[in-house]
């Protein structure tokens, strides 16, 4: 298979951000939004080299005149043409490599439709002619990155959250809980509650502004009701944010009302369990002998776990659910925003992993369905 001098490429295609780089590196070289933007208006200026589509940061910088679309929703690719554009941009513009010379490791959310995996495999081999590829579950990679082999990973990104129990390196698929509630839903909710304040955010470009406010100013309250009282009584919690046009927006209780949805999905009308409850359900679906090890290794990963106060709140909520004598430890590694990618980088540079790749020859022989046999 792959020679020792050929570096594998690791591509973590999130619903919100695409993280890409070379195996063995300690951080991704390229991190850009998983966005494809198309012009709203026809171009009339001569000499401007207008494209029919822009990807990533370029789309972000021209967002005022583009319609922005995310090809990945809730971890599932909904638009394959745009997805190909993102991969093309990743290989040729960001990493500047020829994909036909490098094995590629891709990631996906657990409990994804099988067709999604097959199509990914097909595009990699047929469109990009990669010599070998592999698809891995995101949460498992996060655990690798934290240096553990046992733990319960809560991975929450822009499109999907899931809790995955892993024991001695084995993921326990029957106990995985998937929650289609993540960063993008929080951004949408924030757009809605800011409307109550009289600020209108409606376009795809304005959604990106709200996402920025969310990333910079929100936090998770340890006691939501208490925090609401405090916010009503004083303006101590208020923060201001300067919009691109120079206007200043003041936000108060929206700062902690937004991420509260993670613990109370009913706030956005979703009939689902909060992230603390999903974690608890996952652990309860596991064998009674391994629960203790899972409770003391709850590992957070993904961008939506970056809110200040999340580990304290998580510990508090789980302590209320778990048996009273149970020791609960929530681990929030500082690099958790990229831990899926880091785990992929570690995994694909291991010598023992080299026989795991799906090679072009195997693909030609069996077709896309080989991905279910070779990739757990």
Curated annotation (Swiss-Prot):
Q: Which reaction does it catalyse?
A: ATP + H2O = ADP + phosphate + H(+)
**A cellular component annotation (GO) from this entry:** cytoplasm
- Which molecular-function annotations from GO does this UniProt entry contain? ATP binding; hydrolase activity
Q: Which InterPro entries match?
A: Actin, Actin/actin-like_CS, Actin_CS, ATPase_NBD
> Among its keywords, does the record have Hydrolase?
yes
Recorded hits in SUPFAM superfamilies, A to Z, give:
Actin-like ATPase domain
Q: Which CDD domains match?
A: ASKHA_NBD_actin
What is the E.C. number?
3.6.4.-
Q: Which UniProt keywords apply?
A: ATP-binding, Cytoplasm, Cytoskeleton, Hydrolase, Nucleotide-binding
Q: Does the keyword Phosphoprotein apply?
A: no
Q: What is its main location?
A: cytoplasm
Stated role: Actins are highly conserved proteins that are involved in various types of cell motility and are ubiquitously expressed in all eukaryotic cells.
Q: Which family does it belong to?
A: Belongs to the actin family.
What name appears for this protein in its UniProt entry?
Actin
What organism, scientifically named, is this protein from? Achlya bisexualis
Lineage start: Eukaryota, Sar, Stramenopiles, Oomycota, Saprolegniales
């Amino acid at each position: 298979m792959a020679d020792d001098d050929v570096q594998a490429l690791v591509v973590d295609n999130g619903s919100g951000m695409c993280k890409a780089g070379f195996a063995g590196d300690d951080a991704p070289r390229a991190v850009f939004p998983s966005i494809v933007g198309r012009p709203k208006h026809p171009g009339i200026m001569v000499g401007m080299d207008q494209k029919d589509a822009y990807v990533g940061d370029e789309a972000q910088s021209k967002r005022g005149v583009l319609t922005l679309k995310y090809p990945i929703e809730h971890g599932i690719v909904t638009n394959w043409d745009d997805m190909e554009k993102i991969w093309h941009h990743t290989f040729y513009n960001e990493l500047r490599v020829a994909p036909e010379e490098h094995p590629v490791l891709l990631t996906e959310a657990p409990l994804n439709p099988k067709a999604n995996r097959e199509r990914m495999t097909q595009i990699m081999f047929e469109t990009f002619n990669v010599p070998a590829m592999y698809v891995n579950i995101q949460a498992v990679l996060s655990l690798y990155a934290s240096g553990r082999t046992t733990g319960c990973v809560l991975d929450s990104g822009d499109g999907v959250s899931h809790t995955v129990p892993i024991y001695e390196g084995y993921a326990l698929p029957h106990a995985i809980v998937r929650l289609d509630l993540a960063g993008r839903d929080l951004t949408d909710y924030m757009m809605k509650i800011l409307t109550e304040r009289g600020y209108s955010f409606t376009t795809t470009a304005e959604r990106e502004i709200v996402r920025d406010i969310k990333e910079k100013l929100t936090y998770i309250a340890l006691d939501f009701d208490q925090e609401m009282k405090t916010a009503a009584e004083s303006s101590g919690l208020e923060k201001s944010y300067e919009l691109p046009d120079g206007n200043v927006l003041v936000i108060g209780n929206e700062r902690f009302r937004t991420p509260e949805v993670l613990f109370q999905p009913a706030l956005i009308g979703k009939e689902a369990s909060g992230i603390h409850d999903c974690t608890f359900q996952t652990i309860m679906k596991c064998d009674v002998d391994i629960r203790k090890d899972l409770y003391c290794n709850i590992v957070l990963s993904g961008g939506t776990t970056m809110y200040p106060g999340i580990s304290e709140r998580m510990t508090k909520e789980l302590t209320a659910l778990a048996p009273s004598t149970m020791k609960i430890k929530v681990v929030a590694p500082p690099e958790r925003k990229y831990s899926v990618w880091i785990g992929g980088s570690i995994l694909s540079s291991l010598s023992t992993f080299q026989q795991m790749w799906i090679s072009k020859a195997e693909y030609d022989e069996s077709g896309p369905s080989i991905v279910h046999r070779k990739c757990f």
